């Protein structure tokens, strides 16, 4: 045995391949050994894992309400090391939104977050995504009968009831208690909930509803609708804007609105965009209901990531809460956010 070991070591040194070489088949000197090869895997190596890709779909990309949501989504994507694509129709269009989402399903994206133009029109595409293994959540505007996992939003009904209580308070000493409602896309689940809840409080309290006018989430259309309503009802006592599209633009394009507000018409409006906050400070708007724009992107992307990566379960509805702005001082707090771009605090 010792003789063999010495002979083998001597041979290995002579061959220059060291003591780690494979054992010889016999004691006879073999031909020079090939260089040792790395062990080959029994299966093909796995491809490098690509970053997750989520599609975030607003009702319309031309609506400034969604700009802060986009910023939030981008910030969260950067933190998580994922990609979030901003995919939506230029203007509010449920059919176009569904087509864009179908294209994303075909690309096999990893998840979707959708603000639905219409709950029924978006239900089939949401269900197709879920059936294809693509998790879907909704934010801002829901499709409650779809297979979506959860809905991230303020409680639209609670916020609208609060808005109605404020309108009742503002008009309590006025003999004229007529009011009109401005809405966006007819049938949008979030807007319908706001209108219904507002009227459930306002009408029994003695306020007199005149009309509900849609503007299809379009700023210019909203301006025209409001001016036309005030032409038809110049003595309107109150205006509830379930979305404040006309207030996003140039107030000078609405001379009838300005005149009515200065004459005492009370305005309760959704959202806390920069123009609206300035109008509140000027006394042309009297209460603003603020949604968590930044959270529609930042928080909701985090929720979808938790679902996809961490397999976390969420309830059907996640309540964001809402902000209420009634005083110039409160308006200044949010104007500072617009100025600095810091919406995290």
Predicted feature residues:
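N-terminal secretory signal peptides and thylakoid transit peptides that target proteins
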Residues: 2-22
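Bacterial lipoprotein signal-peptidase II cleavage site
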Residues: 28-36
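Hinge/cleft segment of the Venus flytrap/periplasmic-binding protein
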Residues: 50, 182, 186, 190, ...
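Extracytoplasmic "Venus flytrap"
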Residues: 51-72, 76, 80, 85-101, ...
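Short, solvent-exposed amphipathic alpha-helices that sit
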Residues: 65-79, 159-166, 189-207, 225, ...
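Hydrophobic alpha-helical segments within soluble ligand-binding/sensing domains
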Residues: 97, 152-178, 221-223, 272-276, ...
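Hydrophobic alpha-helical
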Residues: 111-131, 198, 216-279
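Flexible loop/hinge segments that line or gate small-molecule binding clefts
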Residues: 119-158, 178, 273-281, 285-286, ...
